[in-house]
A protein has these predicted regions:
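Repeated scaffold domains used in trafficking and secretory/extracellular systems
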Residues: 7-14, 59-63, 73-81, 116-124, ...
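Beta-strand-rich domains and repeat architectures in extracellular enzymes and scaffolds
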Residues: 3-36, 75-80
Protein backbone atom coordinates (compact mmCIF):
# COMPACT_ATOMS: atom_id res chain seq x y z
CA UNK A 1 0.00 0.00 0.00
CA UNK A 2 1.07 3.57 -0.68
CA UNK A 3 0.30 6.28 1.84
CA UNK A 4 -1.44 9.23 0.20
CA UNK A 5 -2.27 11.40 3.23
CA UNK A 6 -1.02 11.82 6.79
CA UNK A 7 -4.25 13.50 7.87
CA UNK A 8 -7.65 12.18 8.84
CA UNK A 9 -9.85 11.72 5.77
CA UNK A 10 -13.45 12.83 6.28
CA UNK A 11 -14.87 12.12 2.81
CA UNK A 12 -14.06 10.28 -0.42
CA UNK A 13 -16.05 10.58 -3.66
CA UNK A 14 -15.75 9.07 -7.12
CA UNK A 15 -14.81 11.91 -9.49
CA UNK A 16 -14.41 9.95 -12.73
CA UNK A 17 -13.47 6.44 -13.88
CA UNK A 18 -9.85 6.93 -12.85
CA UNK A 19 -10.04 9.68 -10.24
CA UNK A 20 -11.35 10.13 -6.69
CA UNK A 21 -11.79 13.25 -4.56
CA UNK A 22 -10.52 13.13 -0.98
CA UNK A 23 -11.26 15.61 1.79
CA UNK A 24 -8.71 15.72 4.59
CA UNK A 25 -9.04 17.36 7.98
CA UNK A 26 -6.81 20.39 8.55
CA UNK A 27 -6.33 21.49 12.17
CA UNK A 28 -6.96 25.14 12.95
CA UNK A 29 -4.28 26.31 15.43
CA UNK A 30 -6.38 29.30 16.47
CA UNK A 31 -9.48 27.39 17.57
CA UNK A 32 -10.93 23.98 18.39
CA UNK A 33 -12.57 23.81 14.96
CA UNK A 34 -10.90 22.48 11.85
CA UNK A 35 -10.68 23.25 8.15
CA UNK A 36 -10.39 20.89 5.21
CA UNK A 37 -8.25 20.36 2.13
CA UNK A 38 -9.58 18.92 -1.12
CA UNK A 39 -7.53 16.95 -3.61
CA UNK A 40 -7.95 14.42 -6.41
CA UNK A 41 -6.02 11.16 -6.62
CA UNK A 42 -5.41 10.14 -10.24
CA UNK A 43 -5.20 6.33 -10.27
CA UNK A 44 -3.70 6.30 -13.79
CA UNK A 45 -0.70 8.41 -12.83
CA UNK A 46 -0.61 8.02 -9.04
CA UNK A 47 -0.42 11.79 -8.76
CA UNK A 48 -2.42 14.20 -6.63
CA UNK A 49 -4.28 16.96 -8.44
CA UNK A 50 -5.87 20.19 -7.27
CA UNK A 51 -9.66 20.34 -7.05
CA UNK A 52 -11.86 23.20 -5.93
CA UNK A 53 -14.41 23.14 -3.15
CA UNK A 54 -17.11 23.94 -5.71
CA UNK A 55 -16.19 20.92 -7.87
CA UNK A 56 -16.43 18.70 -4.78
CA UNK A 57 -19.82 20.16 -3.82
CA UNK A 58 -21.14 19.74 -7.37
CA UNK A 59 -20.16 16.08 -7.40
CA UNK A 60 -21.69 15.45 -3.98
CA UNK A 61 -24.85 17.59 -3.98
CA UNK A 62 -25.55 18.47 -7.62
CA UNK A 63 -26.61 21.77 -9.13
CA UNK A 64 -28.20 23.13 -5.94
CA UNK A 65 -24.98 22.57 -4.00
CA UNK A 66 -24.80 26.15 -2.73
CA UNK A 67 -28.28 26.09 -1.21
CA UNK A 68 -27.84 22.62 0.30
CA UNK A 69 -24.34 23.17 1.71
CA UNK A 70 -25.39 26.44 3.34
CA UNK A 71 -28.33 24.76 5.04
CA UNK A 72 -26.22 21.83 6.23
CA UNK A 73 -23.34 23.85 7.65
CA UNK A 74 -21.05 20.85 8.00
CA UNK A 75 -21.37 19.49 4.47
CA UNK A 76 -18.40 17.09 4.48
CA UNK A 77 -19.57 14.72 7.22
CA UNK A 78 -22.88 13.37 5.88
CA UNK A 79 -23.20 10.78 3.18
CA UNK A 80 -25.22 12.03 0.22
CA UNK A 81 -27.16 10.55 -2.69
CA UNK A 82 -28.57 12.43 -5.68
CA UNK A 83 -31.85 10.83 -6.76
CA UNK A 84 -33.26 10.62 -10.29
CA UNK A 85 -35.51 13.65 -9.75
CA UNK A 86 -32.44 15.65 -8.57
CA UNK A 87 -33.55 15.60 -4.94
CA UNK A 88 -30.73 14.87 -2.48
CA UNK A 89 -30.76 12.55 0.54
CA UNK A 90 -28.20 13.08 3.31
CA UNK A 91 -27.37 10.99 6.38
CA UNK A 92 -25.00 12.10 9.15
CA UNK A 93 -22.92 9.62 11.21
CA UNK A 94 -25.37 9.97 14.13
CA UNK A 95 -28.32 8.93 11.96
CA UNK A 96 -29.72 12.41 11.34
CA UNK A 97 -31.25 12.54 7.87
CA UNK A 98 -32.51 15.19 5.50
CA UNK A 99 -34.18 15.22 2.09
CA UNK A 100 -33.73 18.24 -0.17
CA UNK A 101 -35.92 18.76 -3.22
CA UNK A 102 -34.63 19.66 -6.69
CA UNK A 103 -34.59 23.34 -5.70
CA UNK A 104 -32.35 22.72 -2.70
CA UNK A 105 -35.10 23.18 -0.12
CA UNK A 106 -35.22 20.94 2.95
CA UNK A 107 -38.53 19.06 2.72
CA UNK A 108 -38.01 16.31 5.28
CA UNK A 109 -35.69 15.51 8.18
CA UNK A 110 -35.54 12.99 10.98
CA UNK A 111 -33.47 10.19 12.51
CA UNK A 112 -32.80 6.90 10.75
CA UNK A 113 -32.60 4.04 13.24
CA UNK A 114 -33.09 0.31 13.62
CA UNK A 115 -34.26 -1.07 16.98
CA UNK A 116 -33.53 2.38 18.44
CA UNK A 117 -29.88 2.26 17.28
CA UNK A 118 -28.73 4.93 14.79
CA UNK A 119 -28.09 3.96 11.19
CA UNK A 120 -25.42 5.74 9.15
CA UNK A 121 -23.66 5.90 5.76
CA UNK A 122 -24.96 5.81 2.20
CA UNK A 123 -23.74 3.28 -0.38
CA UNK A 124 -25.74 3.63 -3.58
CA UNK A 125 -27.44 0.65 -5.23
CA UNK A 126 -29.77 1.78 -8.01
CA UNK A 127 -32.84 3.36 -6.44
CA UNK A 128 -31.76 2.00 -3.05
CA UNK A 129 -28.89 2.59 -0.64
CA UNK A 130 -27.07 0.50 1.96
CA UNK A 131 -26.35 1.67 5.51
CA UNK A 132 -24.89 0.16 8.67
CA UNK A 133 -26.27 -0.17 12.19
CA UNK A 134 -23.28 -0.79 14.44
CA UNK A 135 -25.38 -1.27 17.57
CA UNK A 136 -27.34 -4.11 15.95
CA UNK A 137 -24.50 -5.70 13.90
CA UNK A 138 -26.64 -5.17 10.80
CA UNK A 139 -26.24 -3.92 7.25
CA UNK A 140 -29.50 -2.65 5.78
CA UNK A 141 -30.68 -1.74 2.29
CA UNK A 142 -33.31 0.99 2.05
CA UNK A 143 -35.40 2.37 -0.76
CA UNK A 144 -34.11 5.90 -1.31
CA UNK A 145 -37.61 7.31 -1.68
CA UNK A 146 -38.95 7.45 1.86
CA UNK A 147 -35.98 5.53 3.35
CA UNK A 148 -38.09 2.37 3.74
CA UNK A 149 -36.23 -0.82 4.70
CA UNK A 150 -35.84 -3.37 1.91
CA UNK A 151 -33.27 -5.97 3.05
CA UNK A 152 -31.39 -6.57 6.29
CA UNK A 153 -28.28 -8.76 6.56
CA UNK A 154 -26.91 -9.69 9.98
CA UNK A 155 -28.32 -8.96 13.40
CA UNK A 156 -27.37 -8.37 17.01
CA UNK A 157 -26.94 -12.06 17.84
CA UNK A 158 -25.45 -13.06 14.49
CA UNK A 159 -21.79 -13.29 13.50
CA UNK A 160 -22.09 -12.01 9.92
CA UNK A 161 -20.89 -8.51 10.83
CA UNK A 162 -19.00 -7.49 13.97
CA UNK A 163 -19.68 -3.83 14.81
CA UNK A 164 -20.08 -2.60 11.21
CA UNK A 165 -19.25 1.11 11.10
CA UNK A 166 -18.84 2.01 7.43
CA UNK A 167 -20.22 0.93 4.07
CA UNK A 168 -19.45 1.78 0.43
CA UNK A 169 -20.22 0.16 -2.90
CA UNK A 170 -19.08 -0.32 -6.48
CA UNK A 171 -21.04 -1.86 -9.35
CA UNK A 172 -20.81 -5.43 -8.03
CA UNK A 173 -20.20 -5.39 -4.28
CA UNK A 174 -21.11 -3.59 -1.07
CA UNK A 175 -18.06 -3.20 1.21
CA UNK A 176 -18.52 -3.19 4.98
CA UNK A 177 -15.83 -2.16 7.48
CA UNK A 178 -16.15 -4.07 10.76
CA UNK A 179 -14.62 -3.39 14.17
CA UNK A 180 -11.93 -1.16 12.58
CA UNK A 181 -9.90 -4.21 11.50
CA UNK A 182 -11.63 -6.05 8.66
CA UNK A 183 -13.65 -5.57 5.47
CA UNK A 184 -16.45 -7.86 4.30
CA UNK A 185 -18.28 -7.64 1.00
CA UNK A 186 -21.86 -8.38 -0.06
CA UNK A 187 -22.49 -9.59 -3.60
CA UNK A 188 -25.27 -7.34 -4.92
CA UNK A 189 -26.68 -10.13 -7.10
CA UNK A 190 -26.75 -13.01 -4.60
CA UNK A 191 -26.36 -11.23 -1.22
CA UNK A 192 -23.55 -13.68 -0.38
CA UNK A 193 -21.17 -12.29 2.26
CA UNK A 194 -17.42 -12.98 2.01
CA UNK A 195 -14.20 -11.39 3.23
CA UNK A 196 -11.98 -9.01 1.31
CA UNK A 197 -8.70 -10.90 1.11
CA UNK A 198 -6.70 -8.27 2.96
CA UNK A 199 -6.58 -7.22 6.57
CA UNK A 200 -6.17 -3.63 7.67
CA UNK A 201 -5.42 -2.08 11.05
CA UNK A 202 -7.38 0.88 12.45
CA UNK A 203 -9.52 1.11 9.32
CA UNK A 204 -12.21 3.78 9.17
CA UNK A 205 -13.30 3.48 5.53
CA UNK A 206 -12.82 1.40 2.39
CA UNK A 207 -13.62 2.62 -1.14
CA UNK A 208 -13.16 0.46 -4.26
CA UNK A 209 -12.43 1.98 -7.68
CA UNK A 210 -11.80 -0.81 -10.18
CA UNK A 211 -8.46 -2.43 -9.30
CA UNK A 212 -7.70 0.26 -6.74
CA UNK A 213 -8.92 0.78 -3.20
CA UNK A 214 -8.63 3.80 -0.95
CA UNK A 215 -8.25 2.73 2.67
CA UNK A 216 -8.76 5.38 5.34
CA UNK A 217 -7.43 4.90 8.86
CA UNK A 218 -7.13 6.94 12.03
CA UNK A 219 -3.76 8.30 10.88
CA UNK A 220 -4.37 9.00 7.20
CA UNK A 221 -5.15 7.28 3.92
CA UNK A 222 -3.58 4.65 1.68
CA UNK A 223 -4.01 3.47 -1.89
CA UNK A 224 -4.07 -0.30 -2.38
CA UNK A 225 -4.18 -2.31 -5.61
CA UNK A 226 -5.46 -5.80 -6.45
Amino acid sequence: MIKISNRQIVDVLRFSDDKAVLVEKKPNPDSTSYGVNYFILNFSTGEKEIVTKDAYLLKKYGTKRKEISEKLGNFVMPGAMILEDRSVLVIYPNGETGMFNAEGELVRDGLLSYNDSPVCCIAEDGNCFWSVCEGENAVIRYFAEGAKMDIRIGGKNQLTFDRPHFVSADDKYVYVCCNHNSVRKIDKATFTVTDVNRRYNDITGYYKFGKFAIVTTFDGAYCDKD
